[in-house]
Amino acid sequence: MVQGSDVFAMSMLTIDWVTFLLKLVLVPTFIGVVSLAGRRWGTTVSGWLIGLPFTSGPVAFFLALEQGNFFAHKASEAIMVGIVSVFAFCLAYSRLATSLTWFPSTLAGMAAFLACTFLLDMMALPLLVGFALALLVLVVSALLMPHVGSDRISAWRSRWELPARMFSATALVILITGVAPLVGPQLTGLLSPFPVYATTLAVFVHRSQGGEEAVKLLRGVVVGSFTFIVFFLILSLTIVAWGVASSFLMAIGVSLLTHISSLQVLKFRNRFPGLG
């Protein structure tokens, strides 16, 4: 006779396998779509697409299924504030990218991300204060990004570049999500926005097209991340009262409308081929 604990263990194992398979499928698919969009419309559009919560959204969803709605509510608050660390990464990388190679730029970006995450982990910000902080840092980061020219469409150096991007991003997601549960729920939430896609694409774009193109990509990430902030604000406000399905549907719907609006900001600041 199967015990209740055995059923629970089997269900958790199933969820783990489903989550792992989703990582193997969704991450390379998204990287492929974003890379092809950048090839067609320019790197700014690639960065703008990265602003969608394609990594942290599923993390919050599975946390709700595994740990309950209140746990997901608290994690969503931390995830929303964690985007501040992503802005620190983008700004640090961009300030060096126009004069240095991808390696020191990446080191600076990672150092900024980790330092910011460490500071945020020592704070316990109320939801609306965290929301205001995220918006403020978004605006400041966008204003401090280096000014570069309009997007240009560049061919990839090798036919292996796209598969390499997809593999690198997938490996990074598996590594981060494997380590994160070991450091506690608060830090897990703060680490969930880890700039997997931004790091992968910025490095490849920097190597193949130059530092200015990497800056354009990361500017797109910063502006597009307004959607990220809105998504997790709505999720934090609704998931306990409304449940998983209704709260996620509301967050997704409002976020998509927000993301379309944010594209107009990018079109105003930086004209790119095929969209103007």
Identify the residue ranges that each predicted region occupies.
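Hydrophobic alpha-helical transmembrane segments in multi-pass integral membrane proteins
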Residues: L63-A64, F118-V129, A171-L182, F228-V244
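Structural signature of hydrophobic alpha-helical transmembrane segments
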Residues: I15-V27, L49-P53, Q67-S85, L127-V137, ...
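A generic, lipid-embedded transmembrane alpha helix
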Residues: I50-E66, I229
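N-terminal signal-anchor module of multipass membrane proteins
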Residues: G4-I50
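Selected transmembrane alpha-helices and immediately adjacent juxtamembrane segments
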Residues: H147-L187
